[in-house]
Amino acid sequence: MLDVPLLIGGQSCPARDGRTFERRNPVTGELVSRVAAATLEDADAAVAAAQQAFPAWAALAPNERRSRLLKAAEQLQARSGEFIEAAGETGAMANWYGFNVRLAANMLREAASMTTQVNGEVIPSDVPGSFAMALRQPCGVVLGIAPWNAPVILATRAIAMPLACGNTVVLKASELSPAVHRLIGQVLQDAGLGDGVVNVISNAPADAAQIVERLIANPAVRRVNFTGSTHVGRIVGELSARHLKPALLELGGKAPLLVLDDADLEAAVQAAAFGAYFNQGQICMSTERLIVDAKVADAFVAQLAAKVETLRAGDPADPESVLGSLVDASAGTRIKALIDDAVAKGARLVIGGQLEGSILQPTLLDGVDASMRLYREESFGPVAVVLRGEGEEALLQLANDSEFGLSAAIFSRDTGRALALAQRVESGICHINGPTVHDEAQMPFGGVKSSGYGSFGGKASIEHFTQLRWVTLQNGPRHYPI
């Protein structure tokens, strides 16, 4: 069992009132972590610690910030076993957490490489003798709110580029993966970033709303970033706007994978299975809609069903399990209701659908239409639906018939045709002949429509995590009209 204290000003500490909450393995019910439940005063203290640490961190030479972030990346990767030990909080497979650690370490390395890329520019002025500059400077305290589903990747992403840009951070840990998020903070602390540069707050589920509001409302918090559901993202966006804090929001998705009539079906099937079922479909980029040309749909469905038959979900501790657990049994109940609704309205259950507690077998449905909840609602589970259309215009219309727009994929042997189509798909990300689930630390990552706004990743995120300022230097006398 893991004890999870708060991290405030470089110190591990309990909540001020001593309260804790527990996180149990969704499969076995075993107690995984006992976690400090922060009070509003703890939230204030975390922001105050970050604010106090900001001047020194912002003043560090960029190469020194780079050195410390690189050290953190090495330590993160070296402590992979500790992260895997905490995987029981969400019922995830060890290979998923191993993948998380590798990508998160690369995110820190990429952020380290960006410390010297925070560029300004000289802008010609109409005023004689005026030297005008646009400068990017650190903002101050950045609040990162991270989810549980890819806990190492997404919590690291929430703080890596803010740190590279010279900001200090408060990480609001997920109630479902608090030990993982707290461990990230400890790794950065142990790497020598400095007391208060990274602070981690955990809270009981019932306290989440008031803790988030308190953090956003704090005048010292200058930027907010949030990854999570569209429902909660709207709340975070509204709170941030009320307090005039720019927010970067990466929200829900219902990614389409388009299979054109000339696609390599074997490649499309492999990408679809990976994109739909890896980590039990609990990824914002997960392939939820398989939009297939009618000419090849029957063959595609048959091949995908055969692939899905090899993907057994079970207890992650069982070596026979290819896939793991949902985050909890209530997620299974919710997703099963979506499946049952589709079947009741005429969809064909091709394979899967069996639910035992938090274990849901990978599911494929055909014949889904707009009358069914699965057509529009994000399942966030191991469920993919087949939508058939005749010709690429019909496929495009189906792909764009969604409130979401995060990731998408197109399979075609004609790359020119696919590229032209990709430019018309309403998504922040589109991969040709690759899966919808794909992330690299240096790439711009963000969505459109109800999937949020702004981009994480490399240069794209510098704009959000710095303040652009206009500074002038007057050389010589200046004429004034009065």
Curated annotation (Swiss-Prot):
The active site is at E250, C284. PROSITE patterns: ALDEHYDE_DEHYDR_GLU (PS00687). SUPFAM superfamilies: ALDH-like. The keyword Oxidoreductase applies. It is an enzyme of class 1 (oxidoreductase). Pfam families: Aldedh. NAD(+) binds at G228, S229, T230, H231, V232, G233. Its EC number is 1.2.1.67. The keyword Oxidoreductase applies. Disulfide bonds: none annotated. It catalyses: vanillin + NAD(+) + H2O = vanillate + NADH + 2 H(+). GO terms for molecular function: vanillin dehydrogenase activity. PANTHER family: BENZALDEHYDE DEHYDROGENASE YFMT. Belongs to the aldehyde dehydrogenase family. Catalyzes the NAD-dependent oxidation of vanillin to vanillic acid. This is Vanillin dehydrogenase. It comes from Pseudomonas fluorescens.
